[in-house]
């Protein structure tokens, strides 16, 4: 619908692991332990995407930025590549809903980083590091917070309305 590329940092990182790259080897334990991968590594992967001419002005980031450092890095990368952020939305989902959804995903995808203790660590880390990012972007007039604890079809409708698709 949008003629855009969804860029998931999780997918990029899992691809590095799958390819057995140097980056993949260095991050596998952190990811399996529910830790966030360093900003330096994530930013380098995002930089490659931002400067990909095929994707210019057609990017949708999923799971990035997750820290204030990453948000500031993204601003620099976009400026240096003559791009800008058009819209920002945050899916606000409570811990209980996240746990239920990941338990379902665990059955379907059988991901090694989807055990309960890892999920809880990731959630706590996410909440600690993401709050400053939300404060940073909430000042943007194109920022929208969407209740992510609703049914998926309701969330999809709200996102589509926000994106005008």
Regions found by a protein language model. Name each.
Residues 38, 62-63, 90-91, 147-148:
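Small/polar loops that bind or transfer phosphate-bearing groups
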Residues 41, 45-49, 111-155:
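Small-molecule kinase domains that catalyze NTP-dependent phosphoryl transfer to phosphate-bearing small molecules
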Residues 68, 96, 153:
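Loop/helix-junction capping segments adjacent to catalytic residues or to phosphate/diphosphate-binding pockets
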Residues 10, 46, 60, 89, ...:
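Residue-level signature of catalytic and energy-coupling elements of molecular machines
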Residues 158-165:
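C-terminal alpha-helix
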Residues 5-76, 80, 108:
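ATP-dependent small-molecule kinase phosphotransfer cores
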Residues 14, 28-30, 73-129:
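A glycine- and Lys/Arg-enriched "phosphate-lid" helix/loop adjacent to the NTP-binding pocket
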Residues 1-3:
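A conserved segment at the C-terminal end of the G1
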């Amino acid at each position: 619908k949008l003629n855009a590329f969804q860029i998931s940092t999780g997918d990029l990182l899992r691809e590095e692991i799958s390819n057995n790259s140097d980056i993949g080897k260095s991050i596998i334990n952190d990811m399996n332990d529910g830790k966030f991968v360093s900003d330096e590594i994530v930013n380098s992967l995002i930089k490659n995407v931002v400067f990909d001419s095929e994707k210019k002005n057609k990017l949708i980031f999923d799971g990035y930025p997750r820290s204030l450092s990453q948000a500031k890095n993204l601003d620099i990368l976009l400026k240096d590549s003559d791009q800008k952020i058009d819209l920002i939305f945050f899916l606000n989902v409570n811990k209980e809903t996240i746990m239920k959804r990941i338990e379902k995903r665990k059955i379907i995808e059988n991901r090694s980083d989807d055990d309960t203790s890892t999920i809880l660590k990731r959630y706590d880390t996410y909440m600690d590091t993401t709050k400053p990012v939300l404060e940073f972007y909430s000042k943007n007039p194109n920022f929208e917070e969407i209740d992510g604890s609703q049914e998926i079809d309701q969330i999809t409708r709200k996102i589509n309305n926000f994106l005008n698709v």
